[in-house]
Swiss-Prot record:
The gene is norR2. PANTHER family: ANAEROBIC NITRIC OXIDE REDUCTASE TRANSCRIPTION REGULATOR NORR, TRANSCRIPTIONAL REGULATORY PROTEIN. The keyword ATP-binding applies. SUPFAM superfamilies: GAF domain-like, Homeodomain-like, P-loop containing nucleoside triphosphate hydrolases. It comes from Cupriavidus necator (strain ATCC 17699 / DSM 428 / KCTC 22496 / NCIMB 10442 / H16 / Stanier 337) (Ralstonia eutropha). Pathway: Nitrogen metabolism; nitrate reduction (denitrification) [regulation]. GO terms for molecular function: ATP binding; ATP hydrolysis activity; sequence-specific DNA binding. This is Nitric oxide reductase transcription regulator NorR2. Residues 497-516 bind DNA. Required for the nitric oxide (NO) induced expression of NO reductase. Not required for expression of 2 other pathway members, nitrate reductase (nirS) and nitrous oxide reductase (nosZ).
Length: 521
């Protein structure tokens, strides 16, 4: 039987108003203490994978991992039946947490005993609870019976959390102040947005507030912060969620085709226009149009976009007939649009239309331990991709990730983890090994050096300040430097534009566009 003190504590949490992350974390912590095991995890079933929502005893990146059920036979077996499933030390099935027990950081010790139970809420499958131990024989028949009795309390805690979330959502929709406290602290890692830092929690709360309006939103953030993911979240939480979200990468639109792509064209509008074609605005009618890299739009297109935002009408290229559209616009940029307004490359009136509700997205370096959760996600993806038994970070590697500045943000982190995993395999790591990534495999020290210093001696001179003629403007000086950098990168890469773009740290489409503007092609 459970100690008499544990039941009241578990039941008290069910009737106490707690942020859901706190409630579920307290639950798994109490279970781990009582069963005297190495780790406890509460996992939510989402389509074909399990997402950890609360863990105790696993490495810090565990909350960022996603466990594909089809690749983890123990998890599949737990989900396949109601009741407790136990795997003893002699089980031949691989454990998803091999090498991930936090008590032994840096020690690739396999799990010996494991038990778990599937969970259901309101009659529907919800996920699983798993308990793991390094000591053989931890989960005997008495422990399994105890977990069976506890399952109903775990399911009740999950149901309470769900109901409280629904209540808070209703309060938020009605503008009730009480909704703020619980919502801002949730540390939600739902969908593809992973993070529990204060910065990301505040951002998710702000998105939730503005999502239910039809205000234009301008997402501001550095390259690689995931602006598209936040745009998708805004749309999913809006009243337009059942209608399409249409994504337009403005930087990839050829200037000659931008108007046709956005607004459509009539038959005969230009050579090759053999029929009517609706544009992206019409495709998004009733829903949301996401204008990514909006700062790259040509001035002529900016004027037509402004008219559409003002009047709710579009006019196809080659047609005199206006068409009404009902579209919410979400725009995103990594540029300082105010500076572009000042230098005349972006319309002030369009800027004010788009930035009715500007939302800055924090860079990865300002998100604290979120870097480890995100790393966990990429570790699990690479583990599955490379067919490894386990892939984890050493303590030193975790410290290195936290201290690095991440100029390329989440995208750069993904590339760093993928490269490190491949290096480990190339150095002899086998499929049955528990692979631990050390700092030298991450090679973050080399990434700290600006591209100008490791692209060759010629590149260093390309980044040197240009000699300024009398009366030259700052803009002319900047363009002169950009032109020199592009020319040197192309020379270093033998004329390969894609490799030159990687050397310069920008998208290839942006490089082509910049080169055309500067007269380099």
């Amino acid at each position: 039987m459970l100690p008499s003190a544990m039941y009241p504590e578990l039941l008290a949490d069910l009737v106490t108003d707690l942020p859901h992350a706190v409630r579920l974390q307290r639950l798994v912590s109490m279970l781990r203490t009582h069963f005297r095991c190495g780790a406890v995890a509460l996992l939510r079933l989402e389509e074909d994978h399990l997402r950890p929502v609360a863990v105790d005893g696993l490495v810090r990146d565990a909350l960022g991992r996603r466990f594909a059920v089809g690749l983890h036979p123990r998890l599949a077996a737990i989900l396949a039946r109601r009741g407790v499933t136990c795997f003893h030390h002699d089980s031949m099935l691989p454990d998803p947490y091999d090498g991930l027990i936090d008590e032994h950081v840096g020690e690739p010790l396999p799990v010996h005993d494991c038990m778990g139970t599937s969970l259901a809420v309101d009659g529907q499958p919800w996920g699983a609870l798993t308990l793991d131990a390094l000591a053989i024989g931890t989960f005997d028949a008495a422990a399994q019976a105890e977990l069976q009795r506890l399952t109903v309390i775990v399911e009740a805690a999950i149901r309470t959390t769900r109901l409280e979330g629904e209540i808070r959502a209703l309060q938020l929709a009605r503008g009730t102040p009480e909704a703020d406290e619980g919502t801002a602290q949730h540390g939600d890692i739902g969908g593809e947005i992973i993070g529990q830092s204060e910065a990301i929690a505040n951002l998710l709360h702000e998105l939730e507030v503005v999502a239910d309006t039809d205000l234009p939103v301008l997402l501001l953030g550095e390259t690689g912060v995931g602006k598209e993911l936040f745009a998708h979240r805004l749309h999913r939480q809006s009243r337009r969620r059942a209608q399409p979200l249409v994504h337009v990468n403005c930087a990839a639109l050829p200037e000659s085709l931008a108007e046709s792509e956005l607004f459509g064209h009539a038959r005969g509008a230009f050579s090759g226009a053999t029929g009517e074609r609706p544009g992206r605005f019409e495709a998004a009618d009733g829903g949301t149009l996401f204008l990514d890299e909006v700062g790259e739009l040509p001035l002529a297109i900016q004027a037509k976009l402004l008219r559409t935002l003002q009047n709710g009408e579009i006019q196809r290229l080659g047609s005199d007939r206006p068409r009404r559209v009902n579209v919410r616009v979400i725009a995103a940029t990594n540029r300082n649009l105010r500076e572009h307004v000042r230098d005349g490359s972006f319309r002030a009136d369009l800027y004010h239309r788009l930035s009715v509700y500007p939302i800055p997205i924090p860079p990865l370096r300002e998100r604290g331990n979120d870097v480890l959760l995100l790393a966990g996600r990429f570790l699990e993806l690479n583990r599955a991709r490379l067919g490894l038994r386990s892939l984890r970070l050493s303590g030193g590697a975790q410290d290195a990730l936290r201290s690095y500045r991440w100029p390329g943000n989440v995208r750069e982190l993904e590339h760093v983890i993928s490269r490190a995993a491949l290096r480990a395999v190339s150095r002899g790591a086998g499929r049955n090994d528990i692979v631990t990534l050390e700092p030298e495999l991450l090679d973050l020290d080399g990434l700290e050096v600006p591209a100008a210093h490791h692209a060759g001696a010629g590149m260093a001179s390309a980044f040197a300040a240009p000699a300024l003629a009398a009366g030259i403007t700052l803009r002319d000086a900047v363009e002169q430097t950009q032109r020199a950098c592009i020319e040197q990168a192309l020379k270093d890469q033998g004329g390969n534009w894609a490799q030159a773009a990687r050397q310069l740290g920008i998208d290839a489409s942006n490089l082509h566009k910049l080169a055309r503007r500067l007269g380099c092609k």
